[in-house]
Amino acid sequence: MNRWAGRILGGLGVLVLVGGAGLVASRVWGDRVAVVRIDGVITEGRAPSFWNEGSGAAESLAELSSIRDKRQVKAVVLRLNSPGGSAAASQEIAREVEGLRAAGKKVVASMGDVSASGAYWIACSADRIVADPATVTGSIGVITRVPQLGSLYRRMGIEEEVVKSGKYKDMGSPGRPLTGDERRIFEAMVGDVYGQFVDQVAGSRHLPATRVRELADGRIFTGRQGVEAGLVDSLGTMGDAVRMAGSLAGIKGKPQVVEVRQGGWWPRGDKGQERPAGGESTWRLPGGVMLMMVPVTG
């Protein structure tokens, strides 16, 4: 009796394991909308650290590239909750999004609390942009900061000697002010990246560059103001963005949704519902002092 019971239970165990795997597969694979989240300050490489929340370009690029060849994924929602960050990292992520579109996938950018500057640059690479009415967006512009710590060094008795191969090799050193030539070099660099940003917005939003420059003075907009200015397509929630993505991709009925993250794909619920708002409604700047010596959007 015990022997037969063991066999029956063993058989049930196999059924449960196989059936369970089939259930998960049926929920994760098929015609899907994938959600990729970009949260916090956008940085080059990997996210800053365990303590400093942000989106590293390496992680975001890996997540996006993992979708490109997945035939079951017909559309992507970019959930953006970021004040911006590195200009180069923002460009790299935007290019990867454009690659998804070239591969035939529809992409909708969904803006959370904040989707400004570098995050807006990324949003412009999508087919559609959806924002909440109170979303903070815009901030189209470029900034670089050169800290001046010379007086602090002197008070602390710190002196430095510089040996350099060329007159500009220590350009931006915190121990001394910029020279006139150095300032002009920085201004030209910022101006060049700014022009690239304007071109990205003008091309994707089908706006004249002159109009974009009127808006691109660093000012921020609410989501509703963004729609009026032509920077955002429509107002709506993340759920609205998911439904829009599914519709653009020709998915019948309510789309099933998977979250794409480093280490795997995760179903977002039997009906593709959102996670509680508290899980996606905040962003934090990295702690400590950041000394940015390259153009950054933020």
Question: What residue ranges belong to the model's regions?
Answer:
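N-terminal organellar transit peptides
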Residues: M1-S117, C124, R128-A131, I143-G298
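Active-site loop architecture of trypsin-fold serine endopeptidases
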Residues: A134-V142
